[in-house]
Every structure is written in structure tokens, then in C-alpha cells.
Amino acid sequence: MNVLMVHSKVKAEHVAEVEAAAKRMFAALQQAQPQGIRYTSCRLPDGVTYVALLEIDDGVDNPLPTLPEFRAFQEGLKQWVAEPPTSEPLTVIGSYRFF
């Protein structure tokens, strides 16, 4: 299991755009229902910082880049971010119904 955490801070004036694009992306994921991944995005209390967690099962290719809505979200993010996003792999040491 591979888990990636992405941390993004967006410009306050783009929060509505970010969240609308994220909703479209997650709706597309719900429709496509790709197997072998789990993906979530959360907004932190400051209102402009987001954390996304992506788990991809071993042996599964990341299906996100195949979704037009994901590519549109990634493209928009270039304009919406206040600073470059950071990402890092996580090592899961325990989980209850999360991963």
C-alpha cells in the first residue's frame, strides 16, 4: 500500500473555485469508481489549507491522471495556490477503516 499526503495552501479569493473543482473531481471518481485507490481531501481550520490523502494498492496504476476532471483540477491549482504544494509518502502503522 502506497499512501501520499499532499499539502496545499490556496489564495483566499480562490477557495470557492478550488472546492467547486474538487467536487467535480470527486463526482467523476464516484462515477468511474476506479478500483485499488482511496482518495480524500480535507480543508484545515484556517480555511485556505488543504490536505489530500491518496492510497494506491500495490500493483495498481494511479487512475487519477486519466480523469479529465482531475487534470482540470491540477491545471487550476497552478493558478489557485498561494505557495507550491508539498507532498510526501506516508507509512501507515495502523488504521481503523481509514485505509
Regions found by a protein language model. Give the residues of each.
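Active-site-flanking beta-strand signature of metal-NTP-handling nucleotidyl enzymes
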Residues: N2-K9, V51-L53
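Short hydrophobic/aromatic beta-strand element in the GNAT-like acyltransferase core
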Residues: V3, R38-Y39
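Short, surface-exposed ligand-recognition loops at beta-strand->loop->(often short) alpha-helix junctions
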Residues: K9-A20
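Residue-level signal for secondary-structure boundary sites
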Residues: H14-A16, V60-D61, S95
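An amphipathic, aromatic/His-enriched active-site/gating alpha helix that lines ligand/cofactor pockets
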Residues: R24-I37, L54-P89
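Short beta-strand micro-motifs enriched in acidic
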Residues: C42-L44
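A short, glycine/Asx- and small/polar-enriched loop/turn
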Residues: D46-Y50
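Short, low-order "capping/linker" segments at domain edges
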Residues: T91-F99
